[in-house]
Amino acid sequence: DTHSDATRLEYADIVLDIDAHKVTRAGTPIHLSPTCFKLLRMLMERPGRVHSRERLLSRVWGGEVYVEQRTVDVHIRRLRKEINAQGSRDLIRTVRGVGYALDDHIGQ
């Protein structure tokens, strides 16, 4: 269910092209902000792994910038809205008090 090479990540029906900076879901292009693109890329690089808010902050925003942890929640909400816009199943799992994971088996 997961495939990746140097420039392309695939998970379920989501394809992320790193070099072209493009994302599609079920063949439909999805336009993401640079921050949401980085978040999705990080989640897709390790599907199933729960990423803490702290880890997401340091990898996506960089350790030099002070950003509140709830900023992660706001961007995850935006990312969910964009990748689920076509009525697709939500693949981002929230682990309360911990962080987020990309998970194809939510609620199964």
PLM-predicted stretches and their roles:
Residues D1-E10:
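Basic, amphipathic DNA-recognition helix from helix-turn-helix-like DNA-binding domains
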Residues Y11, R25, H105:
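Active-site beta-strand termini and strand-to-loop segments that position acidic
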Residues A20-K22, G27-L91, R96-V98:
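Positively charged, aromatic-enriched patches within helix-turn-helix-type DNA-binding elements
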Residues L102-Q108:
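Intrinsically disordered, low-complexity protein-interaction/activation regions
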